[in-house]
């Protein structure tokens, strides 16, 4: 096991609720309430959960962009949460952040060269080899952008390109840890894949460790080595990616995974989807005991009286922790061999995998189109428009010829 580079110890962040003319404190929003975990060198720790569970606040606490109400952040053996301003400046070279929204995290009045080169202005004792401009061009090339675009402004780039600029800024000082606060949630799916693949490439080349915060379970599974699941400011489950996704032990994790669409139609009927009842309680007034007991189908009297601890379960593999009094593994979707099964009658009409295709014979596209009764085309080909011309009576959509 690689050495621990970053450790969160019982992190707490409560925001006061002010009311009245005198702005007196009338309560607290418990955004993060006792979260602990370790991050090892070169690994990716994924943090998932519903909106409002405290994921982004946790990321800001790790960066000390928010001062914790209680708890510690230990970075390379030093207490980050109590460091002085001078010590923080030195330590921030080694831990950087990529923000969620690429449209608001970049200054629209500043060129890309100045945005990526800004860390060298703050840390003047860090002099890049070959000069600042050359280093910025190297970073642009490293993240897959044209170095000649160094003098362009953010509005001249797409969303995916802007996020690449944010990543280039984050790795400018060669950090050891990169906190990624939902870096792909504002991007299209195809662009998400490009950014995630870029981050994996940079991790291999630079030896980075990621804290990857997201709400997309598929993206987190693709990139993470370990996964932590948060609910109402607390960690519900933490373990190796394979264990958490294939054998989740916490009811909340099981419910989340049961809602993920199954691409194989032959397996959809083999999974029981768990439907949670009720709404997420307010973090200003969380339930007593286990915070999930108001929506949990396993809840008993003990759950409302005693808060479960995040503990290792005897039947789990490796370091698989779960905060549940009645934690037990549950297989969400079984992976079964369906090669000998009869195809589902609903899909027979469109199943084109015949013996000729299985034998790698030449494919007759006209025959496939005739059998399927469908029209196919790339973007811009407009098969829907062709279908409409065939089905509708002559009128406004009459073809120009043919």
Give the ranges of each region predicted by the language model:
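Short catalytic/signature loops enriched in Gly
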Residues: 2-4, 17-23, 28, 240-353
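ABC ATPase NBD coupling module
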Residues: 21-26, 80-96, 114, 122, ...
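Helix-to-loop junction immediately C-terminal to a conserved catalytic motif
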Residues: 63
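Conserved ABC transporter NBD signature motif
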Residues: 71-79
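Conserved ABC ATPase "signature" region
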Residues: 79, 130-148, 257-258
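Conserved ABC ATPase signature
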Residues: 153-157, 161
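P-loop NTP-binding/switch modules centered on Walker-like glycine-rich loops
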Residues: 176-179, 183-187, 191-269
């Amino acid at each position: 096991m690689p050495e621990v580079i970053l450790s969160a110890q019982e992190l707490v962040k409560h925001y006061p609720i002010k009311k009245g003319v005198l702005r007196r404190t009338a309560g607290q929003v418990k955004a993060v309430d006792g979260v602990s975990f370790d991050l090892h060198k070169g690994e990716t720790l994924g943090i998932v959960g519903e909106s409002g569970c405290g994921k982004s606040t946790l990321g800001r606490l790790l960066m000390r962009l928010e001062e914790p109400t209680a708890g510690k952040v230990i970075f390379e053996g030093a207490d980050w949460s109590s460091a002085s301003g001078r010590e923080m400046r030195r330590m921030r070279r080694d831990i950087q952040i990529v923000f969620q929204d690429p449209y608001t995290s970049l200054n629209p009045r500043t060129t890309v060269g100045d945005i990526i080169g800004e860390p060298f202005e703050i840390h003047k004792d860090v002099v890049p080899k070959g000069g600042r401009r050359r280093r910025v061009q190297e970073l642009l090339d490293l993240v897959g952008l044209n170095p000649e675009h160094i003098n362009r402004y953010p509005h001249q780039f797409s969303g995916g390109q802007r996020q690449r600029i944010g990543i280039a800024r984050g790795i400018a000082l060669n950090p050891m840890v990169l906190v990624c606060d939902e870096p792909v949630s504002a991007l299209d799916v195809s662009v998400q894949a490009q950014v995630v693949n870029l981050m994996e490439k940079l991790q291999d080349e630079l030896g980075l460790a990621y804290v990857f915060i997201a709400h997309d379970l598929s993206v987190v599974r693709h990139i993470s080595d370990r996964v932590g699941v948060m609910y109402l400011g607390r960690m519900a489950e933490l373990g190796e990616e394979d264990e958490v996704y294939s054998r989740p032990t916490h009811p909340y994790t099981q419910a989340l995974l049961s809602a993920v669409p199954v691409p194989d139609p032959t397996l959809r009927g083999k999974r029981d989807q768990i439907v949670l009842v009720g709404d997420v309680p307010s973090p200003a007034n969380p339930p007593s005991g286990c915070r999930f007991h108001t929506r949990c189908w396993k809840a008993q009297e003990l759950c409302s009286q005693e808060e479960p601890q995040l503990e290792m379960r005897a039947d789990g593999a490796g370091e698989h922790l779960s905060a549940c009094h009645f934690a037990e593994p549950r297989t969400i979707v079984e992976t079964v061999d369906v090669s000998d099964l009869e195809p589902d009658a609903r899909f027979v009409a469109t199943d084109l995998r015949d013996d000729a295709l299985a034998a790698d014979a030449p494919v007759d596209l006209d025959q496939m189109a005739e059998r399927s009764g469908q029209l196919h085309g790339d973007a811009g080909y407009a098969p829907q428009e062709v279908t409409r011309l065939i089905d509708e009576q002559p009128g406004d959509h009459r073809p120009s010829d043919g």
